[in-house]
Amino acid sequence: MSSSTSCPIPGCRDQLPDGYSTTPGGTLYATTPGGTRIIYDRKFLLECKNSPIARTPPCCLPQIPGVTTLPAVPPSKLELLKEQKQTEVEITDDEQFEMDM
């Protein structure tokens, strides 16, 4: 019988190091779920960033006011500054239950 130890898999992006799957030259390595290795060169990635397709918003986005579309009427500054009234619940000194002695 052989014993093996397990290594926890990072589940959150915060746990991964900054230079994960990169080289000092800026080349980025990735794999697909099928196992195909993909190599992205730094120059190619910078060209993709400045391409017209990268600057075009995606089609068929849902209409969410304030997120994907501008709101029809911007909220007035007074509405933003208004404080919400909070209802205060009176705390009574009554006993919560009766105690037999």
Swiss-Prot record:
A single GO BP term for this record reads: negative regulation of translational initiation
Mitochondrion as a keyword of this entry, yes or no, is no
Question: Could you give a GO molecular-function term held by this entry?
Answer: eukaryotic initiation factor 4E binding
Description of post-translational modifications: Phosphorylated.
Keyword Phosphoprotein listed: yes
What UniProt keywords apply to this chain's record, in alphabetical order? Cytoplasm, Nucleus, Phosphoprotein, Protein synthesis inhibitor, Translation regulation
- The source's superkingdom equals Eukaryota
* Motif stretch (YXXXXLphi motif): 40-46
Q: What is its main location?
A: cytoplasm
Record-linked InterPro entries: EIF4EBP
UniProt region (Disordered), positions on chain:
1-28
Recorded family membership: Belongs to the eIF4E-binding protein family.
Protein name (Swiss-Prot/TrEMBL): Eukaryotic translation initiation factor 4E-binding protein 3
